[in-house]
Amino acid sequence: MDKHFEQNSELSRREFLKSTAAAGLALTAGVGGTSQSIAAAPAGDNPIRKENAKPGTRDWLLTKTDVTKNEPVELWRSPRIEGYCSATSVSAGDTIKIMVSTNPVSEFSLEIFRTGYYGGDGGRFMKRFDSLKGKTQSTPPVGKRRLRECTWEPSVELGIPKDWLSGVYLGKLTAKKGGVQSYVIFIVRDDRPCDLLFQCSDLTWLAYNSWPTNEYSLYHNDKNGYTGYKKRKKWSTDAADTGWVGFDRPYSQFCQDHLVKNPKSVGTGEFLLWEFPLSYWIEQQGYDVSYISNVDTHTDGPGLKRAKGFISVGHDEYWTREMYDNVSAARDAGVNLAFLSGNSVWGMVPLLPSAKGQFHRVMHRAGKFLGEELSKMLSKRKGWTSTFPAGPDGALLMGGAHRRN
């Protein structure tokens, strides 16, 4: 590809993203409630402006990855060094456990960065752990409904300092032997009033995570392999067509390599691919933003009402019924909603406990947010050969449809 064209394409994508984000925030409205206004150009200091005035760095970027290409056995995995966290989000003052495996066995380092704008660097260094003892931790057996749950020993227990601001945090793992790197990812949340709530789409990251092999996302089964796009296989809740997935495992590289290949995002789910650009822009503009997980939307409905606006970003496909109800209640209480992605509020899932009893760690398909009428109509079409429970209509929440009285 011509270098000049590459540069112009990058500029075009950046400008498109900025324009889309700005339009989305400007047009945000509380459907069905009394909306609160969000200043287009925030004035004065707020925690995000103060945070982004601190020195940034680009050291958060991975420089050497080794994502396995041995299809279909370990495609998209980073077996030389990989890890996961004990929670999707954590409050400042609490502790999060980070589980890491190295193969071959190697000492490793862990550097923690908060992502944001930071003068264009995209991240700020927060903490470093050196000379950590690595070990090769076992790949879990196939469990009920094809669930793969790791029970790795913690490598680090990180107490989140009280002064760490809400945000998306990356843990950069670097093996001493060979220097191979990958990420772990977690969210620091808070409960302060804010302009915007940025919801990370981590249930969808989980749905598309095929770790440990190219076979264990919601879109794989024993008979047909990847069912999402292979000859347009049916979308189904049947056990024969889809399995269960859990957070207790590393994130592999995003499995839809026909859309994007980015091995240097390995371990971050879909955050760096689809969500970080908007976070970068929001913090550049100085909006007072706080970050939450899909799991927080599921568990803490009242907490959504502390914001003027709620933003669904990235690939926000999989929701629980509790998420739908909580966001609807926030809207009715006057919180503005912005859905800045496609394929949102589509698949309905429950959140179940892990084998160890930790809440909200496992999910499976349970239905679609289509409403009864549309669900029945689509089930009769060619290719929609499976019936499944119909949740409420996602379009009603997103403003794509309205009920007539």
PLM region spans:
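An acidic, glycine-rich "communication" segment
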Residues: 347-405
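N-terminal secretory signal peptides
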Residues: 1-15, 29, 38
